[in-house]
């Protein structure tokens, strides 16, 4: 009886501590998601709901004039995911490996590596706009002084360089996060495996390739999931540096920016299209949800295998 009473008391405390998080999730995630889903199936005039639309809003999204915008934005999101995942993961592993082998000052360099992650987006945007200013920015000034003036260009003003530049800025800001995740994964590896490999004559490169890298699988999956979600919800940096229209000339447009334009309307895009915007929101949610579910399933399998 005493054991049952203790378990019952523990359940009460567990429920008590989980309640705030559950209420927050329901209020700020579940309810808005369900509301957006319902909006997608109605016609709208401004912010006034009209009759039931069925799948008409989805049909309009894949028809002129929204189809080309959608496909362009989707392509940009896919390119952003590929670029960020490949480069950020590689740099994150290299940084983590370097930090792992530091004998002194690891805490300091770990802090420096993670510092850009906590910077305000306003600060990041203003700083990089200043750095990349085509006339007064230090980047073009340095290139000109080095005799590389042919490389100097309006990095954020050219349709060929704007998106890669924003991806680079995103990498600079977030690379510290996967580095810390991978560092935690390296620290979790038993030193017995490493010492046994060294005794057998394995080099540090062989130890990394044969032992460390495979055991970073769960960390790699976590980073993959978070990168996928972040890439297909990418809004902040393009919005701050390119505006809601994905300037220049839509070269940095993303699904999230398109959703914003459709849901709220802009001076360039005209009046809002809540129904079509909500349909786009549902599609974004489905893409992110399916990607996250696949990644979570892979992560569970790797945990079972290990």
What function would you assign to each model-found segment?
Residues 4-306:
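A structural signal for multi-pass alpha-helical bundles of membrane permease subunits
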């Amino acid at each position: 009886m005493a054991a049952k009473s203790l378990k019952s008391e523990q359940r009460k405390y567990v429920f008590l501590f989980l309640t705030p998080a559950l209420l927050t999730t329901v209020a700020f995630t579940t309810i808005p998601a369900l509301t957006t889903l319902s909006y997608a199936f109605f016609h709208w005039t401004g912010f006034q709901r009209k009759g039931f639309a069925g799948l008409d809003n989805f049909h309009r999204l894949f028809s002129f004039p929204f189809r080309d915008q959608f496909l362009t934005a989707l392509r940009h999101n896919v390119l952003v995911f590929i670029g960020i995942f490949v480069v950020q993961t590689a740099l994150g592993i290299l940084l983590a490996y370097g930090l792992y082998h530091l004998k002194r000052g690891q805490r300091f360099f770990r802090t420096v590596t993670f510092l850009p992650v906590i910077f305000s987006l306003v600060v990041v945007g203003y700083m990089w706009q200043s750095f990349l200013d085509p006339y007064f920015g230090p980047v073009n000034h340095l290139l000109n002084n080095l005799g590389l003036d042919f490389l100097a260009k309006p990095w954020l003003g050219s349709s060929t360089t704007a998106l890669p530049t924003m991806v680079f800025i995103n990498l600079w800001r977030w690379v510290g996060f996967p580095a810390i995740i991978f560092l935690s994964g390296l620290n979790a590896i038993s030193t017995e495996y490493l010492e046994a490999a060294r005794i057998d004559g394995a080099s540090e490169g062989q130890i990394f390739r044969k032992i460390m890298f495979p055991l970073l699988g769960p960390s790699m999956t976590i980073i993959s999931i978070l990168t996928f979600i972040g890439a297909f919800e990418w809004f902040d940096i393009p919005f701050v540096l390119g505006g809601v229209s994905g300037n220049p000339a839509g070269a940095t447009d993303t699904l999230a920016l398109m959703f914003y334009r459709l849901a709220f309307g802009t001076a360039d895009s005209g009046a809002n299209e809540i129904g079509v915007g909500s349909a786009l929101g549902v599609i974004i949610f489905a893409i992110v949800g399916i990607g996250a579910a696949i990644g979570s399933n892979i992560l569970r399998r790797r945990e079972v295998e290990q």
